[in-house]
A protein has these predicted regions:
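Catalytic-domain carbohydrate-binding cleft regions of carbohydrate-active enzymes
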Residues: 1-211
C-alpha cells in the first residue's frame, strides 16, 4: 500500500506562489474580465501546463514537498481544466488560444509530472488523472471518467466511455465504482447498482471506488 497525493492544477490568489507565477507568465491568461478562472474556496487561476517553464516550476515544488519525501504516485484532479465559466475565447495558453488547442491541456498536465518523475529516476510511472487526450498514454496517464452520478444511466455510459478510451490507444482507464454524486447507502436500488458496478469494475484495467 502506498500513499497517493491529490494535486489540482490551479492556484489561489492567496498562495505564497501566486505573484511569482503570475509575474513569470506561468498561469493561464484571461483575455477579458476579472482574472478568476475557477471559484473554489477562493479565487483561483489555472497553471499553464502547456508552458515548459510552468511544468518545470511546479514539478520542483512537488519534488521538494512530496517526491523527496517518498511519494511516487499522484492524483491529478481537475485536469480538463474545470473553468467556472466555459467562455473559451477568454482564455489563452502559452501554446495558443484555448479555442484552438484547449484539448491538449490534460496531456500536458500529465506530462508535467511524468517528465519530473522520470528525471528523478522513477520507473513504471502511473498517475491517476481526471481527463486525457491523444498521447496522454505516453505520460503514464491512468484516466478515470470523472465525477459521475450514481445512476444506471451513468453506469451504462461508462461502457461507451471505456471503449472510446481504448480506441484512442489509452490502456489505463477506470471509473468511480458506484458513481460519485447522489448515492444513498440505505437505498436498495443503490446497493444493487453498487454490486453491478463492482462486477463491471472487475473487468476494467483498474478497479477503483471513490468515496
Amino acid at each position: 500500500i502506498e500513499t497517493m497525493v491529490s494535486i489540482w492544477p490551479q492556484i489561489d490568489w492567496r498562495s505564497e506562489n501566486y505573484e511569482e507565477m503570475k509575474q513569470q507568465g506561468l498561469l493561464v491568461k484571461s483575455n477579458a474580465g476579472v482574472d478568476v478562472q475557477m471559484l473554489f474556496h477562493g479565487n483561483n487561476v489555472f497553471l499553464d501546463a502547456t508552458n515548459p517553464r510552468t511544468r518545470k516550476y511546479v514539478w520542483e515544488k512537488v519534488k521538494k514537498n512530496y517526491a523527496d519525501l517518498g511519494i511516487r504516485t499522484f492524483w491529478l484532479d481537475e485536469a480538463e481544466p474545470e473553468f467556472s465559466t466555459y467562455e473559451y475565447e477568454c482564455y489563452r495558453y502559452a501554446a495558443g488560444p484555448v479555442e484552438e488547442i484547449g484539448n491538449i491541456y490534460p496531456r500536458e498536465y500529465s506530462r508535467m509530472f511524468y517528465e519530473g518523475q522520470k528525471e528523478n529516476g522513477q520507473e513504471d510511472i502511473v498517475n491517476l488523472v481526471r481527463c486525457a487526450w491523444l498521447g496522454s498514454q505516453k505520460y503514464g496517464a491512468l484516466v478515470w471518467s470523472g465525477d459521475i452520478f450514481s445512476t444506471y444511466e451513468d453506469f451504462r455510459k461508462q461502457i461507451c466511455a471505456g471503449l472510446h478510451m481504448g480506441l484512442c490507444g489509452i490502456p489505463w482507464w477506470t471509473t468511480d465504482i458506484g458513481g460519485f454524486h447522489g448515492g444513498v447507502t440505505e437505498d436498495p436500488d443503490f446497493q444493487e447498482l453498487l454490486v453491478r458496478w463492482f462486477q463491471f469494475g472487475t473487468f476494467c484495467p483498474v478497479m477503483r471506488i471513490h468515496g
